[in-house]
Amino acid sequence: MDGHSNFTQPSDTSHASHTIPSSSSSQRRRLTKKPPPSTSARHHHSSLSIDSRVDAQSLVGKRSSTSLRRAPSAPPARTPTSTHASNSSSPRNPSSSTRLNNHSPIIPAASEFAASSLSPSARDRDSDPARNDHGHQLQNNNNYYYSAFTNAHHHNQYSAASHRRSNSYGHPHGPQSSNSLTFNHSEDFIGAPFDGSAILNRIEATKASPTLGSGAFPHISNPIPVGAAAPAQYSRGSPALEQSFTFPSAAMSEKSQQVRGMEAQLPTSKRYSDETKEPKPGVLRKKSGFSGFMSGLVGTPKKPLISAPENPVHVTHVGYDSATGQFTGLPKEWQRLISESGITEKERRENPETLVNVIKFYKETTEKPAEDQVLEKFHDARPGLPSAPSAGSMISPGLAPHHYNPMSPMISPPASPRFPQVGHEGNFENPRSPPPVPKNKDVTLMPSRPAPRPPVSLPTRTAPHAPYAAKDSGIDMPPQHDDLTPTTYQPPKESQPILPEEHRSRSNSRVNGNTAYPASQQSPAVQAAYQQQLMQQQQEQALAQAQASMSGSMSRAPSKRQPQAQQPTPPQSQHQYSRPTDANGAQQTQRPQQPQIGPVPQSRPRHRSRQSNGLDVVAALKRICSEGDPREIYRSFTKIGQGASGGVYTGHERGSNRLVAIKQMNLEQQPKKDLIINEILVMKDSSHPNIVNFIDSYLCGGELWVVMEFMEGGSLTDVVTFNIMTEGQIASVCRETLLGLQHLHSKGVIHRDIKSDNILLSMEGNIKLTDFGFCATINEAQNKRTTMVGTPYWMAPEVVTRKEYGRKVDIWSLGIMAIEMIEGEPPYLTESPLRALWLIATNGTPQIKDEGNMSPVFRDFLYFALKVDPDKRASAHDLLRHEFMNLCVDLSHLSPLVRAAREARAQEKARKGQ
């Protein structure tokens, strides 16, 4: 060959030099990789030079290499093959007639060859110049490789289909180079076991042997022992290659598998000259071999094992089949609620999605875990409280027994719908009178107007809070003072039957409380937070109730809503506090619920939260609380309510003799201590003439004392229940309420529970907002909220339908409260809570019974306040500029209404024999 062939040994990067005998002269040639021939002429020239230079002398030289002889038991020694020797010239792949990379095979002379045969595949390959070039180059590239690793190279220049066993080495001139056959690459390494000594011997022999003349094409191989049959062509993948008779097929097959394993380890992807298939199939085949080798070596990668679900929770999915007009996947409880709600089939078909949202909202706001039930603000707290205390026991002369009676109604049995119960429990829905223990009967406390029947599930919710009654003792007050007047504490049995409805009407309205509860239900952590909030709300409601009861507005016991809200709460003041607490709790719970849900554990979140947050909360409280003992600053404590974590009292400030409301809480019983801090901070920042103001707070002996302004007149509920108000008086109440809301909204606070129960009056007619338990804070980043809180009957449509809402929810509630002042009760109060929610969601703006008797200005005021679309609804600032505000009267005109309400309640109480 004219070109140099450079071969790289697998184990050595150095170039090997071969000394090959030549008929003319010896020359050491450095074999370098031959560049692909550019013309067919070069191939032709190479073939001619091979024919002319290969002679018997070269073969004799090969036979004289005694150093390469092997013992009978030793594997055949490996010798370097000529650059054109077939890669398969090994025991398994004896060289068959090799072909040159020319366009047509060269026929050897008859004197030089005994026989020569080309297989059809070989001939086909010869006919393809590109393929010949490729095969020729690869063949050259592998000859040296095999010279080092094959034990013997048997060149069978002939034997195609005839399988003739003729030894090509027996001829003086072997035509090995005349025709180069291609072999399956899988046979590259087939041969005897690897022999390192043979390789070294071969290297020495090559150095000692003479080289061929320039241009000669070496094709020498080791001599075959006498008697050894010349191996025949063998190919696994091509009919052109035949199996040697010298080796059994089984042994060859075994060796072939070993060779394939070695090939698989080679990173090279080149195609060898002995491949009989197209390059592409060859690559695919090698890839398959590599994959198989790697899978056997590394093993099949393990697939991730997915276990079965642990602790699965079934979540009900309710759908609606428009074809049949029926709900799908409706739980039995929901079916019962729908059937008992009074929602007709026609209504269901018209608004199926709304019904689903309303039911979900109702369930979320009414169902709570057992923990929450225990925390329900004033539910069984009353039993522990003595009902005997007389009005005289009350420190404030303004507080009459009848005032306390209203509180009893508030205690109305838990039979009231869930919503009412929520109000009872911890909400200050009826701040005027905290709910008495259900056991006590208070006929006088029965509300004058009927309330809707409580939902079946709601009654169960009323959980006794009696265990908390002992907490009140923390104030060291005489039982008489602790207890409200007998009327106040007497559990209204009658009120139980009547109050359930009444309470539901007002207390049920306390959906907020329920809402807070549902949130807690959803998450134990939330539940714990809600419980704390309820306790706080209960206390706040108790204060409000106490204030209302003392002012006489509590006498409004007839108002069925208040009794319901108060049922869960203890005394009136308790109810007030409890409400704020409940409301606050609900609101705070919702706000805190989000952050606190994580920290609070499920069943015992309270304890854990206390343990984890106790020290931090106490430290924070010490920073914001005043030093000193409240018992030394205030005197004449009178208990007016009971909450889950403490009681609500009235007291007089020493020196000034100012009457205040005191909320006492046992920190150890507070599941969410951080909520307390939030409530105190909100109250401190909400100082306004139309907001019940925060006076001071003390941390004493593990108990937190919160001192607030006390409103003797009680809540607006008593006023609207026992009196008919003029538009001027209604306008005055709306104005004062709007001023308080404007202040809250300016600070990014949403009250979320505006209703008559949370509007307190003084004996002079001053009006202030209370019960901030459900307050929520919004900011630029979060100007909408989605938590469901508030009282069902006063709720805005966007809240009922579980949509985002903002400050405008308070405006809607104000409009409903205006209707309440007109009609004595809010719309849908006689409906079950679920149906009320349904009507709010579907009817939008409620219809006023005697709208014709209202002035156009008043109707226009309500028109803007009760817009279903919150974007079109007026703001507090807008309504304060409405013409309706021109009808406002002096607040002193409200004083007679407050006194009349107190008297009416006292008379009602007397009629009941209490």
From Swiss-Prot:
Main location: cytoplasm
Biased segments, Basic residues type: 156-166
Positions that bind ATP: I640, G641, Q642, G643, A644, S645, G646, G647, V648, K663
Biased composition (Low complexity): 13-26, 63-72, 79-97, 516-548, 562-576, 587-596
Span of domain CRIB: 306-319
Assigned EC number: 2.7.11.1
Region described as Disordered: spans on this chain: 1-140, 156-184, 251-286, 408-615
Polar residues biased stretches: 1-12, 175-184, 577-586
Function recorded in the entry: MAP4K component of the MAPK pathway required for the mating pheromone response and the regulation of cell polarity and cell cycle. Phosphorylates histone H2B to form H2BS10ph. Is involved in conidiation, aerial hyphal growth and infection-related morphogenesis.
UniProt protein name: Serine/threonine-protein kinase MST20
Protein's organism: Pyricularia oryzae (strain 70-15 / ATCC MYA-4617 / FGSC 8958)
Gene this protein is translated from: MST20
